[in-house]
């Protein structure tokens, strides 16, 4: 029996609009990390911030959106609701990409949509977002943070540290991963930078004390609707799902708290979608909801970046009767198979990965062993709160699968007993299991 949820992709598309749509961004000339994370005082008469983008920067936004929709199309779950932050992945991978070289770096560039701009283009894009997104709307709270935890005795390349600090405002901390506290420290960092929405990004069985490092990005968004829903208007109504049993579609009606209002909104109608844009605060951030027309019960087809651009161009203000579920959704996803399908292959193998610009230890074969994201969204009559943390765990392939050489004598072998200083052989033998 296969269950389809119409909101599975819609919730993700919302996050793409909220987060990937943050192509407007924070000014922090003193590079003060604390200042980046302070909530800005509300000013009810503040007008939308004007963001002037060069042609190159507009191309960066387009490239980022291309990755966003490709990512969700590849990761889309046909049964469950889902929430992802493409831009959080871009931050985490973009930071790490400064330690990559050769084909590994080229694959990362291409997957993120920066085949032409390269690592420098990703750095510029992320810096622009980091600097500007938090200050676009004083009515909306946006926080972006990056960090790196290194395991002793590994050291980061000086040039990597320089770029991580300059473009991502990332600080690195070296710890003994066997101290029994590092996982808690990482999870606390995630919680602190998402207003406690993401309290555990690394589960106990996911944290490896033999890892070389963990790179993290956290993004947090909280915005009140410019036109709030009246709670008195919220009613439980039927929500249509489809059950597939023996190749037969059976409609299942489930009650959902449905918010309601009638007002003027940006809206467009195409052959494939009804699209509605709901603004937050002063209008600098919006949520765009895509409702499929061909089959209102099916998981929506994820649009391309080009279709997304066309939808935005066709939007027009009109009176709309809106019903939208009040809901919460969270996702904990392993990104390794997703990124492989998108074309980022070499980075996940100690035999093909080239992170020679990441770690000082020349003999190390650094590769990505873990890449995941935890994301959450809450949507109600007041507005939306959403957060995501992306973590990338690096391993040393030259030290064996678990950080040390593997010597499993599980087939015939020779043995020698000798005097240590001279090497004089006292006994020599073999063991064949018989």
PLM regions with names:
Residues 1-3:
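N-terminal secretory signal peptides that target proteins for export/translocation
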Residues 102-108, 297-299, 331-333, 387, ...:
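Extracytoplasmic/secreted cell-surface and envelope-processing proteins
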Residues 292-316:
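Internal alpha/beta scaffold segment
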Residues 5-7, 11-14, 20-177:
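Detector for small/aliphatic-rich hydrophobic stretches
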